[in-house]
């Protein structure tokens, strides 16, 4: 069926007629829901894959995302703000673009946008970390003393926690770190512990008894757990007889994160400071290749996290990001009184592509993260500093999108862009019915009800990184459903036609969020496009999706298109659309550049 319609693609030279809001002519296509073929560009299957050109090795490197100049990177580790400088530590392979030989890379910044790359902060040079300096955290002790606690692996791959201090705290960059002579300071001792599943310590916090607390990801008697430890001095740790929280229906929890949040207040909270009345806590874990979380309270009497809602089926747990995003780490930014979170976005091309490129992995744009006013979910938004890269703004108002309409967003660099668009629903009467079972696998639903399948309200959204003839394009869009007395919005990022290149992962990512359409008819979408990295924020940050895309058009042609579209029965208005070309940031460039 896919190839049966591929022959139609050559006639769709969109540049010849997509110069206004509407298509002047159509080609009938029953696969497009009988709409006269207006949405053919969304439903026609791409022709056979083609091999990448030699330019692939350079064209997919991002312009304003955090990544080292070369080689492999993965988890963010120990981000902090200290003495006027932001520090980003990260898992790094000095020797190549594949996983292995992991050390702690280290970069510094004054604005979270431009970064200076330094020598690694931690390398594998002691018996307790010879297998790798794995993920960890930074805690700033009283008196302004930062301390790293990280997981090390020994020659037998047993895991334990280690400590390191800055050699010279007067150095603004904190270039050199000294490991504690008594490392490791914490081993997986005790009944029911698994010595090869004991890693990724959190930032520490002080409890009501004045003792430090810390959680470590692990397994306890076969349960996944955020194991809880106490210390008077941050050097000598004692295991608490119960975990901070555990669950018997999931895999081992990596990279746990624990922090306080105030409903409806985007100000950050320092977990070691006095927590105000009404605050909630978030417990995040990396599991099943994604980052999930729970909202609840930290019961000081029990010294335990208590979720507001206990959900046994982990497929229903909330997600930080519904795309290629893992091993996130947050920190309290005392500079601007906010909590910031980073995540690792892996490559989804082939290992041979990574070897050709000479690099693999990046970190998402730093995001402010806070709790929604109803206390049910976390919201995220790119830090305001990233807007300093905006240039060449274009703006449109009062656009009306009927079924099958495209509107081209011109005069911005389609490979490096920031697009903010607001969709206003003329009516909500046409919303299709919601099936609660879709919550178990929103990605599957995005794949089945793609942008080519018309609905009552939606799909509507953006088509990005589109080639001239639309044989390559990525769709980021919404669908609206009615669920009893509320409305559910599905946000999708569909990569299935994103590239003609072979050996790529091209899924359809997706997530649902509740939205009170009786009160507010406007749904916002912000998409940041940075060559092979796309980050989208729907409904004011209710759903976030990070995607990795590798269109051949980027390497072969050097131009692409961005469109707003609607393929639903209900008319959608666009009261405001703004887009900017994004300038290149200075990220871990060659020595000699300095912004400090």
From Swiss-Prot:
Signal peptide positions on this chain: 1-20
Catalytic activity: Hydrolysis of terminal, non-reducing (2->1)-linked beta-D-fructofuranose residues in fructans
Active site, UniProt feature: 75
Xref: Gene3D superfamilies: Exo-inulinase, domain 1 (2.60.120.560), Glycosyl hydrolase domain, family 43 (2.115.10.20)
GO molecular function terms noted in the UniProt entry: fructan beta-(2,1)-fructosidase activity
Protein EC: 3.2.1.153
Residues annotated as glycosylated: 168, 236, 248, 567
InterPro entries to which the protein is assigned, alphabetical: ConA-like_dom_sf, Fructan_Metab_Enzymes, Glyco_hydro_32, Glyco_hydro_32_C, Glyco_hydro_32_N, Glyco_hydro_beta-prop_sf
Cysteine-cysteine disulfides: 446-492
GO-annotated biological processes: carbohydrate metabolic process
Keywords: Disulfide bond, Glycoprotein, Glycosidase, Hydrolase, Signal
Family annotation (SUPFAM superfamilies): Arabinanase/levansucrase/invertase, Concanavalin A-like lectins/glucanases
Protein family membership: Belongs to the glycosyl hydrolase 32 family.
Function in brief: Hydrolyzes inulin-type beta-(2,1)-fructans. May play a role as a beta-(2,1)-trimmer during graminan biosynthesis.
Protein name: Fructan 1-exohydrolase
Organism: Aegilops tauschii (Tausch's goatgrass)
